[in-house]
Amino acid sequence: MSQPLTVDCPTCGAPVEWSEKNAFRPFCSDRCKLIDLGAWAAEEHKIAGSEGSEDELYSGDLEPRH
């Protein structure tokens, strides 16, 4: 029988068994999951992109709604 896959919790680093039994995976607990969500909401985490990529997204190609 194979060993269950274990990953580190992204928030606290605790070992976490990656299985359907763990409702919080990849986190070890609801607390760590909420800490991570709060960091995203506070913009402490960001998805990498080039400078000005947000400006390109809103470049004025679309007519404004009135």
Swiss-Prot record:
> Could you tell me the keywords of this UniProt record?
Metal-binding, Zinc
Locate the residues binding Zn(2+).
Answer: 9, 12, 28, 32
Cofactor binding note from Swiss-Prot or TrEMBL: Binds 1 zinc ion.
Asked if the keyword Zinc belongs to this entry, the reply reads yes
**Superkingdom, taxonomy of origin:** Bacteria
Q: Which cofactor does it need?
A: Zn(2+)
Report residue spans for region: Disordered. Answer: 45-66
Gene Ontology MF terms: DNA topoisomerase type II (double strand cut, ATP-hydrolyzing) inhibitor activity; zinc ion binding
* GO terms of biological process kind: regulation of DNA-templated transcription
Record's function text = Inhibits all the catalytic activities of DNA gyrase by preventing its interaction with DNA. Acts by binding directly to the C-terminal domain of GyrB, which probably disrupts DNA binding by the gyrase.
Q: Describe its partners and assembly state.
A: Interacts with GyrB.
Classification via PANTHER family: DNA GYRASE INHIBITOR YACG
- Tell me which NCBIfam families the record gives: PRK00418.1 (NF001638)
As for family, the record states:
Belongs to the DNA gyrase inhibitor YacG family.
Name by which UniProt lists this protein:
DNA gyrase inhibitor YacG
Q: Which gene encodes it?
A: yacG
